[in-house]
């Protein structure tokens, strides 16, 4: 028989056995929370769950395919992988002038804003204003590789540093009548004739001759001035530059003793109802070469018309309106780099409707393309000086004619119209193989400004 002490120990052990079991073994529901394997997620949102990228690619090296399984998106995978392999090449901001950097493996790519190029967008295309005029609405100047835009008189530079804002209702070069049209800078007569510049016709219509020309509607040639002699007959044209200045040709001035001026009219058949403006003074360029002068010991008809430019000062100011607006005076660089590279210029006048015919009572207008200098010089039997340029057609019968002399050659840039030439001379009117010859206004900008500044 077991000793009493051993029996007591056995009974005590058996009594505490259920409690010991409960402390050693977990209930199945609780145990499963620790022992059951959690299924991995491959959803697109896994990249936002802490530890996934670190577990796959930071704590241990991963493959691109493993990264792809995490992101399940090619673009996000590429972005991550380029940085993961060799670091972020864009961290130093290598793209200049607000270019956008995209990282690559061992490289980067800059996407440049317009007008910049180069690996780092470091090259400024507009540094010399030769591309799209530096994005300037009017004048462009390059200063230390920076573009400086400026505007014609009566305009101010816009807040963007490129646009030009008119400071008045009748700022220069504004074709007010055409502004509400779909193509605001091109009046009806320009839109009607744009196709002529794109094709040549073996049988051109006589309706499109400048000497039989298209009518300029009221307000579409607002810078046009008309010069009348003492008999109130039209003898030349002109261009309004300011309220007291009209630009014309020097060879017009000696054709009459008295000059009066008409502005804002497209029909001058009833001159008695039209206001004639008196002239105060006329300034002719001192270097003007008349068509006939003593050459050696002989009278030689040279017909050079060099320096064929004059300015008329009005006795009373011209009143501006929708139908009377001055043309803008350009800069010489702007003419050379921009205006003379346009498709065409605009010529208007009350001149003869045919060679040696009668002058027109209605204002006529035509668009004429610029002619390269070599072609111009080869076409003429007379000298073409550096102060002249040619415009017109060699085959189409379109040209200015007698009575149009002194009138405007205008070139539009955007919605602004600039004076680029003075109708000077030609060999006949619309003669085949010949062009109209115009005084190159850009050569006389300082002279014009000097005369206009006189009191």
From Swiss-Prot:
Annotated propeptide span(s): 21-40, 182-209
Cysteine pairs bridged by disulfides in the record: 57-62, 90-101, 95-110, 112-121, 129-140, 136-149, 151-164, 172-328, 216-221, 236-252, 376-390, 401-429
Residues where 4-carboxyglutamate is found: 46-47, 54, 56, 59-60, 65-66, 69, 72, 75
EC number of the protein: 3.4.21.6
A biological process from GO: blood coagulation
Subcellular location: Secreted
Keyword Translocase recorded: no
All copies of domain Gla, residue ranges: 41-86
Calcium is among the record's keywords: yes
TM ranges: none
Limits of the EGF-like domain: 86-122, 129-164
Enzyme class: hydrolase
Gene Ontology cellular-component terms listed: extracellular region; extracellular space
Signal peptide: 1-20
Coiled-coil region(s): none
Tissue expr: Expressed by the venom gland.
Stated role: Snake prothrombin activator that attacks the hemostatic system of prey. This protein is functionally similar to blood coagulation factor Xa.
Similarity annotation: Belongs to the peptidase S1 family. Snake venom subfamily.
Protein known as: Venom prothrombin activator nigrarin-D
Lineage: Eukaryota, Metazoa, Chordata, Craniata, Vertebrata
């Amino acid at each position: 028989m077991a000793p009493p002490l051993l029996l007591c120990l056995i009974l005590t052990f058996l009594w505490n056995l259920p409690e010991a079991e409960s402390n050693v073994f977990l209930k199945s529901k609780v145990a499963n929370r620790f022992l059951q394997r959690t299924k991995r997620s491959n959803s697109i949102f896994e990249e936002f769950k802490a530890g996934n990228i670190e577990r796959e690619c930071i704590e241990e090296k991963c493959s691109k395919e493993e990264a792809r399984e995490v992101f399940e998106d090619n673009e996000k995978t590429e972005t991550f992988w380029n940085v993961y392999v060799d670091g972020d090449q864009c961290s130093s901001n290598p793209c200049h002038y607000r270019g956008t950097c995209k990282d690559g493996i061992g490289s980067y790519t800059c996407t440049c804003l317009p007008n910049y190029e180069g690996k780092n967008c470091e090259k400024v295309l507009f540094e010399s204003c030769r591309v799209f005029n530096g994005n300037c609405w009017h004048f462009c100047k390059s200063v230390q590789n920076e573009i400086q835009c400026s505007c014609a008189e009566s305009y101010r530079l816009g807040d963007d540093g490129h646009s030009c804002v008119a400071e008045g209702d009748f700022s220069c070069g504004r074709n007010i009548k055409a502004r509400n049209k779909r193509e605001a800078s091109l009046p009806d007569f320009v839109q009607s004739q744009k196709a002529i510049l794109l094709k040549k016709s073996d049988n051109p219509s006589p309706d499109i001759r400048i000497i039989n020309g298209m009518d300029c509607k009221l307000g579409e040639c607002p810078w046009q001035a008309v010069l009348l002699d003492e008999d109130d007959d039209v003898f030349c044209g002109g261009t309004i530059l300011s309220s007291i200045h009209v630009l014309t040709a020097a060879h017009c001035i000696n054709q009459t003793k008295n000059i009066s001026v008409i502005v804002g009219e497209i029909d001058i058949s009833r001159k008695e109802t039209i206001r004639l403006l008196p002239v105060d003074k006329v300034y002719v360029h001192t270097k003007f070469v008349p068509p006939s002068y003593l050459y050696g010991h002989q009278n030689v008809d040279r017909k050079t018309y060099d320096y064929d430019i004059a300015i008329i000062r009005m006795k009373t100011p011209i009143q501006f309106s929708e139908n009377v607006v001055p043309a803008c005076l350009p800069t010489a660089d702007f003419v050379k780099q921009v205006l003379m590279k346009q498709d065409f210029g605009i010529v208007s006048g009350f001149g003869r409707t045919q060679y040696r015919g009668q002058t027109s009572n209605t204002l006529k207008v035509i668009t004429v393309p610029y002619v390269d200098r070599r072609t111009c010089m080869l076409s003429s039997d007379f000298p073409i000086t550096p102060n002249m340029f040619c415009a017109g057609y060699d085959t189409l019968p379109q040209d200015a004619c007698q009575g149009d002399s002194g009138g405007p050659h205008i070139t539009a840039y955007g919605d602004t119209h600039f004076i680029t030439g003075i109708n000077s001379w030609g060999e006949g009117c619309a003669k085949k193989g010949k062009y109209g010859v115009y005084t190159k206004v850009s050569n006389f900008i300082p002279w014009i400004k000097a005369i206009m500044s006189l009191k």
